[in-house]
């Protein structure tokens, strides 16, 4: 652990560096400290912090910058999230106050709002689908070989996909299959639609003389409805925060961000990783080396979970430079997760 004075100096350096992005010298620290300390004392304490691995010296300046370990100490012990200004509050309320038709529209807009407010890359995932129930399934013929499958759930979401059937399927055959499927599916949670239930539906379809391709169609649309959709906004902001001129690395970074499974794994929320100095905070911070990817060594990932009661939990996240202003970003995420949860609860209330 550090002494109280060392903690004060480390916090001062980090707060200055995350605003100016310039190495911080002892004179700057001395002028910003709330207590009077000599320049020599500040220099000695900065040297001690450097020996502990919490500060680093740059080649181009006599000033110091925080190391990854320094940021981690700050996040775990010293940070105080800042309340967002009224202008940001009003902007969030305004942008969330739209006539959304589906949950996914709200979640997608959440990613856009966060990216616009921060100029970072933002992620948003909707609440889990465990409690969502099927309210209807339809197949609409589009041509002699093409149909659209539509699945509706009790949270107002509608999933549809277009399929090409290998042979002509008449309308009567399709309607019969739809009735059989609805008899088995309606009222059941998406999470309960497993292989056993699908096998039972398949047996009914075969016994009724329906085309086996209809079961494949059903499986695809259910898989799509039950999968977690991760929305990403502000990918272009990665370039402004990326210090490498290596085009191949930039392409790899973009590819990583576009991989839904990789991102879902990356921002997987672990309550044990919430910042430790404030029990009320619900924001998790992972620094570059903690993200286990060479592509992200200069970035930090801030993740917050939001709860929509019985409808489950979702996640929002920000990916930005390691020298981001953490107190402001954490304050923003803490506020935004609550407003997003309120908006989703209002939306779900329409279907009671």
From Swiss-Prot:
SUPFAM superfamilies attached to this UniProt entry: GAF domain-like (SSF55781), Winged helix' DNA-binding domain (SSF46785)
One term of GO molecular function: DNA binding
Keyword terms: Repressor, Stress response, Transcription, Transcription regulation
Bilayer-spanning residue ranges: none
GO biological process: negative regulation of DNA-templated transcription
UniProt xrefs under InterPro entries: GAF-like_dom_sf, HrcA, HrcA_C, WH-like_DNA-bd_sf, WH_DNA-bd_sf, WHTH_transcript_rep_HrcA_IDD
Record-stated family: Belongs to the HrcA family.
Function: Negative regulator of class I heat shock genes (grpE-dnaK-dnaJ and groELS operons). Prevents heat-shock induction of these operons.
Listed name of the protein: Heat-inducible transcription repressor HrcA
Source species: Lactobacillus gasseri (strain ATCC 33323 / DSM 20243 / BCRC 14619 / CIP 102991 / JCM 1131 / KCTC 3163 / NCIMB 11718 / NCTC 13722 / AM63)
Protein's gene: hrcA
